[in-house]
Amino acid sequence: MKQLVLASGNAGKLGELRAMLAGVALQITAQSEFGVQDVPETGLTFIENALIKARHACLMTGFPALADDSGLIVDALGGAPGLYSARYAGTPTDAAANNAKLLEMLRDVPVGRRSARFYAVIVLLRHAEDPQPLIADGCWEGEIVFEPCGSGGFGYNPIFFDPLYGMTAAQMGAELKNKISHRARALEQLRDCLHTFMA
């Protein structure tokens, strides 16, 4: 079984990725298990940040690395929090504070004008200088509710509502979320290529 490093120490992401890639012959380990710290996200796009993280993980561990950069894009806020989703309320990152700030920013925005989407880019590098990274992206359309609802998931899940399913991401079971999320959609693009890419 091939080793693949997740360029993140986020336990929620690691669990999601392991569940979504079940059946693929990969041992997925968080970079934190190798003592690798997060690298500053200095890119100006989701793709740049994912590449920065994947290269850093490859360089520090010597293994192929998978990195994602994702965020919540809210139309009424001109795309914010976007690239700064994890640090929207400042650092250190705090999901509850991020959610509270976002809800405050949308306080006067009525139903019907609270459209949003989760967007994810996933990058897979065989080595730090891989000239041909595998890149996929995924989008999950929804809207922002007026108050948090549900206890599952992480990040903005309690305030991101999927009208098709009539619930927030935090109210969904992991099985459903792992089929329809932005990250799941990006990983679905990668799944078929993983066997060849890792050979």
Curated annotation (Swiss-Prot):
Mg(2+) binds at residue 69. One of its GO terms (cellular component) is cytosol. GO terms for biological process: nucleotide metabolic process; purine nucleoside triphosphate catabolic process. It catalyses: XTP + H2O = XMP + diphosphate + H(+); dITP + H2O = dIMP + diphosphate + H(+); ITP + H2O = IMP + diphosphate + H(+). Keywords: Hydrolase, Magnesium, Metal-binding, Nucleotide metabolism, Nucleotide-binding. This is dITP/XTP pyrophosphatase. It comes from the Bacteria. HAMAP family: Non_canon_purine_NTPase. It is an enzyme of class 3 (hydrolase). Pyrophosphatase that catalyzes the hydrolysis of nucleoside triphosphates to their monophosphate derivatives, with a high preference for the non-canonical purine nucleotides XTP (xanthosine triphosphate), dITP (deoxyinosine triphosphate) and ITP. Seems to function as a house-cleaning enzyme that removes non-canonical purine nucleotides from the nucleotide pool, thus preventing their incorporation into DNA/RNA and avoiding chromosomal lesions. The active site is at 69 (proton acceptor). Belongs to the HAM1 NTPase family. Its EC number is 3.6.1.66. Binds 1 Mg(2+) ion per subunit. Homodimer. The keyword Metal-binding applies. InterPro entries: dITP/XTP_pyrophosphatase, ITPase-like_fam, RdgB/HAM1. It comes from Xylella fastidiosa (strain 9a5c). Its cofactor is Mg(2+). Substrate binds at residues 8-13, 70, 154-157, 177, 182-183. It holds the Pfam family Ham1p_like. Gene3D superfamilies: 3.90.950.10. GO terms for molecular function: dITP diphosphatase activity; ITP diphosphatase activity; metal ion binding; nucleotide binding; ribonucleoside triphosphate phosphatase activity; XTP diphosphatase activity.
